[in-house]
Amino acid sequence: METLTSSSQSLISSPMSKKDYSSEIICAFDIGAKNPARTVLEVKDNSVRVLDISKLDWSSDWERHIAKDLSQYEYTTVLLERQPRRSPYVKFIYFIKGFLYHTSAAKVICVSPVMSGNSYRDRKKRSVEAFLDWMDTFGLRDSVPDRRKLDDVADSFNLAMRYVLDKWNTNYTPYNRCKSRNYIKKM
């Protein structure tokens, strides 16, 4: 299902009550101006449910758009992809932290990107492959539109899933640090 709103394109969405204290709502943002992405997962009773995966648009009036995107759910944890010191996107991290400081009980955590390796292109390719594997696992592959630029939503989804798997002390091979050039061929 694809839902369109003025500031985001939702790839996968499902309704949820605003307050469910027995579950943990995890939100992960892949930061960027042109192609930011958000994934929202609900972890409840040792199961994971995908609530939302969205491509966002923060290219203009970014404060209003980010505030709107942050206000859609009541998160328990917000994961932000760590940015280099002089990155122009650091302002988004500070804005999100400041916005949630007094308005939410959510923990805000800056995390390193999930994939590591030799080249940017290889990391993005592995991220998309892992994302599509997870979509198969969740039975949501048909909901993912065919498009070339899936790496942003893949990165946000992988941030959230790595966080969940780390909490469960579960190892997932594609998320392991790998320096081999032939990693993709070995999968």
Curated annotation (Swiss-Prot):
<keyword id="KW-0449">Lipoprotein</keyword>
<dbReference type="GO" id="GO:0006281">
    <property type="term" value="P:DNA repair"/>
</dbReference>
<keyword id="KW-0564">Palmitate</keyword>
<comment type="function">
    <text>Nuclease that specifically cleaves and resolves four-way DNA Holliday junctions into linear duplex products.</text>
</comment>
<keyword id="KW-0227">DNA damage</keyword>
<dbReference type="GO" id="GO:0000287">
    <property type="term" value="F:magnesium ion binding"/>
</dbReference>
<dbReference type="GO" id="GO:0000400">
    <property type="term" value="F:four-way junction DNA binding"/>
</dbReference>
<keyword id="KW-0233">DNA recombination</keyword>
<dbReference type="InterPro" id="IPR012337">
    <property type="entry name" value="RNaseH-like_sf"/>
</dbReference>
<dbReference type="InterPro" id="IPR006932">
    <property type="entry name" value="HJ-resolvase_A22"/>
</dbReference>
<keyword id="KW-0472">Membrane</keyword>
<dbReference type="GO" id="GO:0006310">
    <property type="term" value="P:DNA recombination"/>
</dbReference>
<comment type="similarity">
    <text>Belongs to the RuvC family. Poxviruses-type subfamily.</text>
</comment>
<keyword id="KW-0378">Hydrolase</keyword>
<keyword id="KW-0460">Magnesium</keyword>
<keyword id="KW-0540">Nuclease</keyword>
<dbReference type="GO" id="GO:0016020">
    <property type="term" value="C:membrane"/>
</dbReference>
<protein>
    <recommendedName>
        <fullName>Holliday junction resolvase</fullName>
        <ecNumber>3.1.-.-</ecNumber>
    </recommendedName>
</protein>
<keyword id="KW-0234">DNA repair</keyword>
<dbReference type="GO" id="GO:0004518">
    <property type="term" value="F:nuclease activity"/>
</dbReference>
<dbReference type="Pfam" id="PF04848">
    <property type="entry name" value="Pox_A22"/>
</dbReference>
